[in-house]
Swiss-Prot record:
Biological source species: Prochlorococcus marinus (strain NATL2A)
PANTHER family xrefs: RIBONUCLEASE H1
The protein, known as: Ribonuclease H
Membership in a protein family: Belongs to the RNase H family.
Disulfide bonds: none
Name of one Pfam family that matches: RNase_H
Function field: Endonuclease that specifically degrades the RNA of RNA-DNA hybrids.
SUPFAM superfamilies, sorted: Ribonuclease H-like
Gene3D superfamilies: Ribonuclease H-like superfamily/Ribonuclease H
Protein keywords: Cytoplasm, Endonuclease, Hydrolase, Magnesium, Metal-binding, Nuclease
Length: 161
């Protein structure tokens, strides 16, 4: 079965930062109906944990543009910042010219605007408590931390599932 034929049924993202700001990393995964999964990660030398959370979500949404996914698919995240930004704050930020309720410029505006791009799929975010034993969240956390610390970590892809 090729990547294009697989049906994505779950996704998860996380961000981490060693110091805040400091070196950061993000992790993401997509789980497929056939039991396979694919993992991704990246880093930035000087960033914040919130930027890494947003970067992970943006990356996974970009990937899901080109993958068939179940209508029930959600993206699991332990970031209330990401969830509240997408679900509660963004409409008001846009109305106010990307300013907060106090009139200050929205932080991480470049990433928020990218997440709001109309070509990205609209997928529900699902809050999961971090470090709680939730398998996908624990895995993307391990990926994010490894990337933030410059450690090597084996990422699953279609060749090594």
């Amino acid at each position: 079965m090729s990547k294009e034929e697989k049906l994505a049924i779950a996704a998860a993202t996380d961000g981490a930062c060693s110091g805040n700001p400091g070196p950061g990393g993000w992790g993401a995964l997509i789980r497929f109906q056939d039991g396979s999964e694919i993992e991704f990660g990246g880093n930035s030398p000087e960033t914040t944990n919130n930027r890494m959370e947003l970067q992970a979500a943006l990356f996974i949404l970009e990937k899901l543009k080109n993958i068939k996914f179940a209508p029930s698919l959600t993206i699991k995240t332990d970031s209330k910042y990401l969830i509240d930004g997408m679900d509660k704050w963004m409409p008001n930020w846009k109305k106010k010219g990307w300013k907060t309720a106090s009139g200050k410029p929205v932080l991480n505006q470049d990433l928020w605007k990218a997440l709001d791009h109309p070509e990205l799929p609209k997928i529900k975010l699902q809050y999961v408590k971090g470090h709680s034993g939730e398998k996908d969240n624990d895995r993307v956390d391990a990926i994010a931390v490894a990337f933030s610390k410059g450690r090597k970590i084996q990422l699953k892809d279609f060749a090594n599932n």
